[in-house]
Amino acid sequence: MTMKRCKSCGQSLSNEDRISQLPEALLLQILSLLPTKEVVAVSVLAKRWRFLWKMVPSLEFFYYFTNDLERFSYNVSKCLFSHQAPFLQSLHLNMNFGCDPRIMDFEILIGIAFGRQLRKLVLKVYSGDWFKFPTSLYNSETLETLELYHCILIDVPFPVCLKSLRTLNLHEVEFVNDESVVNLLAGCISLENLVIHQTTDLNVKTFTIAVPSLQRLTVIVEYYEEFSVFVVNTPSLKYLKIEGIIVDDRTCIIENTPELVEASIIDVSFKVFESILGSLASVQRLSLKVSLVEIFSLPPISNTFYHLTYLELSTYKPKWWNLLTLMLDTSPNLQVLKIFDFMTSQEQRPWEKWNEPKNVPECLLLHLETFVWTCYEGKLENEIELAKYILRNARRLKKATFSIIEINPDKRVEMVGELKSVVRASNSCQLVFI
């Protein structure tokens, strides 16, 4: 160990490599946070580090189309062959081809990774053409997480075998046909979490999600081409998020979700909204964002939400209170109600009146304890009367919070005073203004 002496104080200073003294497990964890190219580069810093990079459990590679593709493929293959950890925890390939992605043989690289008992594969492809994911790679004993992004074409002519796969994320990929969807999901017998984020897919007419083991499902759609039906048959599902299915000729059929506990429905068409709402009888927590739902004249709901205790309603449309009234009437055990009012007074129509229910909803009389209104404007009679109605009738209410948008101080004092003057049904109700 080299020793130097400080000129100012005469104390000895050490050039000791303190990082190398860290436990190997911690060093590997630190190295896992770096791109693999940098991990290999730092191996020259100390003798102990020379071979440590070969034990790093996670590898990440970036390719840009201006780089030498042949050299890139060679370096990735070399790293994979040199890998000495008990198994490969994750492999991230971020590829920007700018041209035809078929010029690179992914099958060999990913096949080597599978031979290292790969647990997680993340593949992101940016290209002017679609990259067809190799069918031979749909069979793995160890893969637990598969994330495919962007210009990837999925063609599965036969059922796959991904028996350890628990998380599948499909982001802006495209399927060849309906059968490819069915065959891919049918081979994922342990799948628990599925995320589908589509921006274009002209080939699939019926997107069938039939996975007995699935517990969490997120479907986000951001395109407007023809697309017939989403069919969901997931008897173990506990969480559901549906967003962006806004074209009226599209629908979503939820056939079997008896275990569903939480759901979030965002920006869907009226047809989809009507279809989904009747399938949520078992949910305990529900979030509704109704910016695109036609809620001027909602039909009656046949089922009652006996298990629903938590409701969030985000408002963007005139007459949104019709939906609120409907949900209050059909949720007898509701305990928490949160309103996010993103609609300004300029957007509302003063002639559209809120009609007080003929009978006070059971949830207000017996169960509602928490009421939150975010972005409360208090300018229109409708929202003022609705807020007063809840305060006057919620007998078990413990806390009512109003987040008031920025207004002049005098108007704020007047608004707060008006709500404070309401004779509350609950003597223990605390009013909070923020």
Swiss-Prot record:
Keywords: Leucine-rich repeat, Repeat
Record has 4Fe-4S as a keyword: no
InterPro entries found in the cross-reference section: F-box-like_dom_sf, F-box_dom, FBD, FBL13/AtMIF1-like, LRR_dom_sf, LRR_FXL15/At3g58940/PEG3-like
F-box domain residues: 16-65
Matches recorded under SUPFAM superfamilies: F-box domain, RNI-like
LRR repeats: from-to residues: 69-95, 100-125, 145-172, 173-198, 219-244, 265-290, 315-341
Name of the protein: F-box/FBD/LRR-repeat protein At3g26920
FBD domain boundaries: 353-403
